[in-house]
Regions:
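Metal- and O2-centered redox machinery and metal/ROS homeostasis
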Residues: 1-213
Length: 213
C-alpha cells in the first residue's frame, strides 16, 4: 500500500521510535534553568518558539516537501541557527526520522541523509503526497514535544497541558499559513530565541539530563 496522509500522522506520533521524545526544542533547558515554573510560563515559552522559530522551520519543511534541493535548504537552516547544540539536536532528529522511515516504508527507498529535522520531515512528507499539510503537521509535532517536557519534568497535569496545546491551534495555523507563499530558499525567514539557544548550549554540557535538547 502506498504511503498517504495517514502515514504522515505517524511522523507526529510521540511513540515513533525516531528519538523525537528526547527533544523539547529548548523547553527542557528553560525548565532546568528555573524559567518555567507553571503552565502559564510554559505557554509563554511555547508561543515564543512557535512565533519566532516556527516560520523558519515550517518554511524549510514546505520547500523540502515541494522538492527543492534539500542540501541547499539544510545550509540555509545552518546559517539561521546560531546555536551549535540546537543544530546538532536538529540533525539528530532528522537522521532518526529518515532511519525509521527507510525501515517502515522500504518501498520508497529514502536516501540516507544528515539533514536538519524540518528538511527530513519535508522529504518524507513529499513521498507521502502530503506536501501541503506537512508544515502544519511539523509545527504541531514541535508544539507537542515541547509541551511534553512540562509533564515529564515539572509534573504538570497532562490534561491541562493537552488543553493548552489545543488552545494554541490558532497559532499553529497562523504560522503555517504565513509561509504558504514562500517558493524559494532566499525567502526563508530567519528566527531565533537567543535566550533559549543559550540555555540549550549550557544544557548540552550537563552530565545528567532527561532530554537531549
Amino acid at each position: 500500500m502506498s504511503p498517504n496522509f495517514a502515514d504522515l500522522l505517524l511522523l507526529v506520533d510521540s511513540r515513533l521510535p525516531a528519538g523525537g521524545h528526547a527533544h523539547s526544542g529548548g523547553i527542557a533547558p528553560a525548565i532546568e534553568a528555573g524559567l518555567i515554573k507553571d503552565i502559564d510560563q510554559l505557554e509563554i515559552a511555547l508561543r515564543a518558539r512557535l512565533k519566532h522559530q516556527g516560520p523558519m522551520q515550517a518554511a524549510a519543511v514546505r520547500l523540502a516537501a515541494k522538492g527543492l534541493n534539500p542540501d541547499e535548504i539544510d545550509h540555509a537552516l545552518d546559517i539561521r541557527m546560531p546555536s551549535k547544540a540546537a543544530r546538532a539536536a536538529s540533525r539528530a532528529q532528522g537522521r532518526g526520522l529518515i532511519r525509521v522511515a527507510d525501515q517502515v516504508w522500504p518501498e520508497i527507498g529514502f536516501e540516507v541523509i544528515d539533514h536538519h529535522h524540518p528538511v527530513a520531515f519535508g522529504v518524507i512528507a513529499k513521498s507521502f503526497g502530503a506536501s501541503e499539510v506537512a508544515p502544519l503537521a511539523f509545527l504541531q509535532q514541535s508544539l507537542m514535544s515541547g509541551a511534553s517536557a512540562g509533564v515529564r519534568l515539572m509534573g504538570f497535569d497532562p490534561i491541562s497541558v493537552t488543553f493548552l496545546v489545543s488552545q494554541m491551534r490558532s497559532i499553529v495555523e497562523e504560522v503555517s499559513q504565513s509561509i504558504t507563499q514562500i517558493e524559494s530558499i532566499d525567502e526563508m525567514p530567519a528566527g531565533s530565541l537567543p535566550g533559549l539557544e543559550s540555555l540549550t548550549e549550557n544544557y548540552s554540557k550537563a552530565q545528567v539530563r532527561l532530554f537531549a535538547s
